[in-house]
Amino acid sequence: MAKIDTFSYKLGAADCFCEMVQTGVKQIALAHPCDTRAARDEYLPYFEDLCQKYGVKLYVEDVPLLTDLFPLSMNQGKYNAIFYQEDSALDAYLALKVEKQAALEAGAYTPETRRDIAWRFGKLLSYTDEGIRRLLEQNQEKE
């Protein structure tokens, strides 16, 4: 079996994510997170080519939305890219980030609010209700 290097694997996944966004399977899709900005930026020319190929857009994410949907270590302090087609989808993602920050600052980031924001993030990623429930239940590394 041929060995696939990590860069190529992650780029192939991004290709798939762009196709899913283009066809309406996903509203937004996240590339694989990178440990450094420089590592993420190595992908950007390829991501831009993929976006042109599929007619989708790219948002370069330096401060990811952290929710209980994914283990904290998967995204905390990481650098990412978001693929989307409709500006309203990116706007909804950015609004979730603002809403979470406002709740934190107001001391209102309750368990209910945390779950609600994580749930809506999952819906933006076009996950099913069952998929979101499973991710929330299985995540042992929450904020």
Name what the model sees in each region.
Residues E141:
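Binding-interface segments
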Residues R115-G122:
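An amphipathic, hydrophobic-aromatic interaction surface with interspersed Lys/Arg
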Residues M1-Y109, R120, D129-Q138:
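A conserved ligand/cofactor-binding region detector
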